[in-house]
């Protein structure tokens, strides 16, 4: 009987469509809230680096997020708020040097986030309904069996990308790596993701982004990770952009 179960499991895995895999990923269990210290290292083509230290807090699978910059000194006080809606994302930045809150419009979501190789679009979850998914041939990545998905944004997504190729580990549904292409079909970015097992969750520990076109890279590491601490919904409000957390 055991071999029948294994066979049926394999048939089920092989039969899943790209959309079904994307839906599984979207429904993957995650902490109710998450806080961490974030270190972001930017490196240009000459090898010169710049390091940012941030505090990040998020709620509901990162659909609400606040980021406060701590270092370097000239960026201290800059902060970012994101609230995702079905109709679109509300993103705002507090820029203390100008004493103003800047709203990030849909036309600007392809812009770089604080000089990094992540765009504002990269900071948002992808709405499953805003993309077309094609399952490509499965591959092995670092000895892990992976689904491979081609993701093409629909027009309504207003994406700055033409497509993504994503490698997703079958067992954990962790996104291991992704290549993003511009609308001309040229590869633009390669991203690699690493995870830490905390309680019953796989939580992002490190993200590495290589910008092929700009010959620039970004490495983001997360430390002092805390989950399910009961963050309040009213934390994610514009008024708190100006309030550095203790």
Residue ranges and their predicted role:
Residues 25, 54-59, 192-198:
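Extended lipid/amphipathic-ligand handling interfaces
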Residues 3-13:
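Sec-dependent N-terminal signal peptides
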Residues 34, 38, 65-67, 91, ...:
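One face of beta-strands
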Residues 35, 61-62, 85-89, 172-175, ...:
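A short, compositionally biased
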Residues 16-33, 39-41, 48-50, 75, ...:
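Flexible, processing/modification-adjacent segments and terminal tails
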Residues 58-62, 137-145, 198-200:
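Short, ordered beta-strand-loop transition motifs
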Residues 81, 111-113, 119-126, 145-237:
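Gly/Pro-enriched, hydrophobic low-complexity segments
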Residues 37-75, 134, 173:
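N-terminal, post-signal-peptide region of Sec/Tat-exported proteins
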């Amino acid at each position: 009987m055991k071999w029948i179960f294994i066979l049926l499991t394999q048939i089920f895995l092989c039969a899943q469509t790209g959309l079904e895999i994307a839906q599984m990923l979207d429904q993957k269990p995650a902490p109710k809230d998450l806080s961490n210290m974030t270190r972001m290292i930017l490196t240009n083509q000459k090898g010169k680096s710049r390091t940012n230290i941030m505090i990040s807090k998020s709620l509901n699978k990162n659909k609400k997020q606040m980021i406060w910059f701590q270092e370097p000194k000239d960026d201290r006080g800059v902060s970012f708020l994101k609230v995702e809606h079905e109709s679109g994302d509300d993103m705002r930045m507090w820029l203390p040097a100008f004493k103003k809150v800047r709203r990030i419009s849909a036309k600007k979501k392809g812009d770089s986030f604080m000089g990094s190789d992540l765009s504002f679009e990269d900071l948002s979850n992808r709405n499953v309904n805003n993309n077309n998914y094609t399952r490509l041939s499965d591959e092995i990545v670092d000895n892990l069996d992976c689904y491979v998905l081609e993701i093409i944004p629909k027009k309504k997504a207003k994406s700055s990308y033409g497509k993504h190729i994503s490698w997703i580990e079958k067992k954990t549904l962790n996104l291991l790596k992704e290549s993003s292409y511009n609308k001309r079909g040229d590869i633009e970015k390669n991203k690699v993701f690493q995870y830490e097992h905390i309680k019953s969750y796989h939580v992002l520990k490190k993200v590495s982004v290589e910008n092929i076109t700009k010959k620039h890279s970004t490495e983001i590491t997360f430390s002092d990770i805390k989950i399910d601490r009961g963050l309040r919904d009213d934390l994610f409000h514009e008024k708190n952009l100006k309030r550095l957390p203790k």
